[in-house]
């Protein structure tokens, strides 16, 4: 049962992957349309990607905690 709970906790990784993929596509599209805006777009993209990855890391930690039954 704990393996199922850990698997459900890791579903957040699916959402993170989709979200970062969409954000990367939109950032690339924006930079392609306005290359001079690279300095404004890229840092915001990195901050957003880092925040999204934090969710994935938290869900991984929760999954490990569930498996080890802490």
Curated annotation (Swiss-Prot):
One GO CC term on file: plasma membrane
Listed InterPro entries: ATP_synth_csu_bac/chlpt, ATP_synth_F0_csu, ATP_synth_F0_csu_DDCD_BS, ATP_synth_F0_csu_sf, ATPase_proteolipid_c-like_dom, F/V-ATP_Csub_sf
Compartment list: Cell membrane
PROSITE patterns: ATPASE_C
GO MF annotation: an example: lipid binding
Major site of localization recorded for this protein: membrane
Record bears the keyword Lipid biosynthesis: no
Family under the similarity heading: Belongs to the ATPase C chain family.
Quaternary state and interactors: F-type ATPases have 2 components, F(1) - the catalytic core - and F(0) - the membrane proton channel. F(1) has five subunits: alpha(3), beta(3), gamma(1), delta(1), epsilon(1). F(0) has three main subunits: a(1), b(2) and c(10-14). The alpha and beta chains form an alternating ring which encloses part of the gamma chain. F(1) is attached to F(0) by a central stalk formed by the gamma and epsilon chains, while a peripheral stalk is formed by the delta and b chains.
Protein name: ATP synthase subunit c
Organism: Caldicellulosiruptor bescii (strain ATCC BAA-1888 / DSM 6725 / KCTC 15123 / Z-1320)
